Amino acid sequence: YRELRKALSKYMNGEKQAKVPALIKPIRIPSFQFTEMAPLFDNLPAAKKDRNIRTMEEYNQGFGSILYRTTLPEMKTPSLLTVNDAHDYAQVFLDGKYIGKLDRRNGEKQLEFPACPKGARLDILVEAMGRINFGRAIKDFKGITQSVELTVDIDGRPFTCNLKDWEVYNLEDTYDFYKNMKFQP
């Protein structure tokens, strides 16, 4: 900050810069205990049903998070989950259990996925983390932008299934969303 001020002063033709404000003294926050919580999956808004994956913008949502949910066929062996593409950060859950994360910044698109029974619930929670407004990435849609696939090995050959029939939960980061959450001890 100070170096930038010094550099700018060369071009101010004698004008004086505003004074640097005094530093704000840090405060001490006393320790405290959390007494309640509001689990996200217990506080979801009404779902939108959709055959195909769509971005946040296609659901008229510009920020926050979005949860994609579907049920799976029986997977007798582990498979490979591919999310094309999660913008920006996705957490993957199978029947409520955390499986892993996909981070766009690291180019992550795939996770090893465990075997599961028919009807197991797949949840993909995608968080939008700001907008890119320049260069190649200016088309910066949020959520899942293309598809979700499971690839399983059958008799030595890969078989890929494009998952369909989604329940979609728009989780806008607003006071109205949070004020209606049901808290529990």
Regions found by a protein language model. Name each.
Residues 1-183:
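Carbohydrate-binding surfaces of carbohydrate-active enzymes
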